Swiss-Prot record:
Species annotation: Caldicellulosiruptor bescii (strain ATCC BAA-1888 / DSM 6725 / KCTC 15123 / Z-1320)
Record's cofactor remark: Binds 1 pyruvoyl group covalently per subunit.
Record text on subunit structure and interactions: Heterooctamer of four alpha and four beta subunits.
Cofactor: pyruvate
GO BP terms in the entry: alanine biosynthetic process; pantothenate biosynthetic process
Molecular function via GO: aspartate 1-decarboxylase activity
Family listed: Belongs to the PanD family.
Catalytic activity as recorded in UniProt: L-aspartate + H(+) = beta-alanine + CO2
EC number: 4.1.1.11
Keywords of the record: Autocatalytic cleavage, Cytoplasm, Decarboxylase, Lyase, Pantothenate biosynthesis, Pyruvate, Schiff base, Zymogen
Protein name: Aspartate 1-decarboxylase
InterPro entries the UniProt entry points to: Asp_de-COase-like_dom_sf (IPR009010), Asp_decarbox (IPR003190)
HAMAP family recorded: PanD (MF_00446)
Pathway as given in its UniProt record: Cofactor biosynthesis; (R)-pantothenate biosynthesis; beta-alanine from L-aspartate: step 1/1
Length: 128
């Protein structure tokens, strides 16, 4: 049996661009991708904190250190520049793997610079 769990998360990233006339996807700063363990072309779920939208897309690698978080194609209609979003990737684990699994959580500031890395979240933890 397999269980789908959170693999990694970039928490409260700021949308820097929304490009409607692109094929599709989300462009993420390569530095953030590496810190979170998110790979190019990997499927991710995006949650918009500002408006509650939730959607899936795939990742394109952005310029390292740029802070770029750009929603492309149809997803560009679901965000505004400046919105705060959560980007999550999931993985399938066996029950044996599950008990040793720790997600990679990347907390960023308003410029999408890494401020903290973690492998857990506490209930009611507020990162504002």
């Amino acid at each position: 049996m397999f269980i789908e769990v959170l693999k990694s998360k970039i928490h409260r990233a700021t949308v820097t661009e929304a490009n409607l006339n692109y094929v599709g996807s989300i462009t993420i700063d390569e530095e953030l991708m590496k810190a979170a363990g998110i790979y190019e072309n990997e499927k991710v779920q995006v949650v918009n904190i500002n408006n509650g939208e939730r959607f899936e897309t795939y990742v394109i690698k952005g310029e390292k250190g740029s802070g770029t978080i750009c929603l492309n194609g149809a997803a560009a209609r679901l965000v505004q520049v400046g919105d705060k979003i959560i980007i999550m990737a999931y993985c399938l684990l066996t029950m044996e793997e599950y008990y040793n699994h720790k997600p990679r959580i990347v907390f960023v500031d308003d410029e999408n610079k890494i401020v903290r890395l973690s492998d857990k979240e506490e209930h009611s933890e507020c990162i504002c």
